[in-house]
């Protein structure tokens, strides 16, 4: 899927943060960073590629702030916290403590949803996938028309 990983030492990662080279980043554990380099994204965009990110809410807000209306931000949320609890408990893979941590994080993340362009409620997976696809298609058609208009006006 065109995913490339670059492994940097914690010191080099911190230096690149200080130099403003990251579009978004997060220190997920002490000295364990993940992030997206601006230069890599720009190379992909210049090559005519569409770039899709699966990032946390802060990363999503940072990307949207950087690219403005050249980016589409989608927030996918559960129908409710109670439904999320039910789903997590139904998996039978996490302890009650881990489930509570995930629910607390979900509540925190939900507070960011108004900052996104589109909120999709994942009540039914197939419906949510179809709605997401339609939102993306609509956004890309608007972007394509905008590029055409810019070309016409530049002549």
Stretch-by-stretch model annotation:
Residues 90-94, 108-155:
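NTP-dependent small-molecule kinase module
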Residues 51-56, 66-90:
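Conserved phosphate-donor/acceptor-positioning beta-strand/loop module used by diverse small-molecule
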Residues 43-47, 65-69, 111-113:
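Conserved catalytic network of the ASCE P-loop NTPase/AAA+ motor domain
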Residues 6, 72-74, 118-120:
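Hydrophobic/aromatic beta-strand patches that form the interior of the parallel beta-sheet core
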Residues 1-51, 58-61:
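ATP-dependent small-molecule kinase phosphotransfer cores
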Residues 56-57, 124:
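Short glycine-/small-residue-rich Rossmann-like dinucleotide-binding loops
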Residues 13, 52, 106, 120:
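Residue-level signature of catalytic and energy-coupling elements of molecular machines
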Residues 96-107:
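Glycine-rich S-adenosyl-L-methionine
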């Amino acid at each position: 899927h065109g995913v490339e990983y670059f492994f940097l030492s914690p010191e080099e990662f911190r230096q690149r943060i200080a130099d403003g080279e990251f579009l978004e980043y997060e220190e997920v554990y002490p000295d364990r960073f993940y992030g997206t380099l601006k230069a890599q994204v720009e190379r992909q965009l210049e090559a005519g590629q569409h770039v899709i990110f699966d990032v946390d809410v802060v990363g999503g807000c940072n990307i949207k702030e950087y690219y403005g209306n050249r980016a589409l931000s989608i927030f996918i949320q559960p129908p409710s916290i109670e439904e999320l609890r039910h789903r997590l408990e139904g998996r039978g893979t996490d302890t009650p403590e881990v489930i509570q941590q995930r629910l607390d994080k979900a509540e925190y993340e939900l507070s960011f949803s108004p900052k996104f362009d589109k909120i999709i409620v994942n009540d039914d997976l197939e419906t949510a996938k179809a709605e997401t696809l339609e939102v993306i298609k609509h956004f890309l058609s608007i972007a394509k028309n905008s590029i055409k208009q810019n070309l016409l006006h530049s002549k």
